[in-house]
Amino acid sequence: MKLGFIGTGKITSSVITGICNSSIKYNRIFVSSRNNKISKNLKKRFKKISIEKNNQKIIDSCSWIFLAVTPTVGKKILKDLKFRSNQTVISFISTITIPQLKKMIKVKSDIL
């Protein structure tokens, strides 16, 4: 299983640390390079981390997508990203509801 994180802040860092220190099976974790300091630190700490500059490449590569950006950034970037129906999308975006997110990503994915 490949996991992808759009947004690289405290939430992403905490979730990835939890995943990497657990018994969850995964092949690779892709993180956006939005916050270089945090993404480089994660890559240094955990060997299965890859940093990606292009959010669409993260979505194209992963079956689980974690959205951890601010609401303003989410509204700006999500409309241009192309998700697949077989992906699971997990959103940490505080003010974007699941029905709103479904309209933005335009695909019948599982959204949590």
Go through each PLM region and give its residues.
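NAD(P)+-binding Rossmann beta1-loop-alpha1 motif at the extreme N-terminus of oxidoreductases
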Residues: 1-53
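Rossmann-like NAD(P)(H) cofactor-binding subdomain of soluble oxidoreductases
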Residues: 36-38, 46-49, 55-60, 64-112
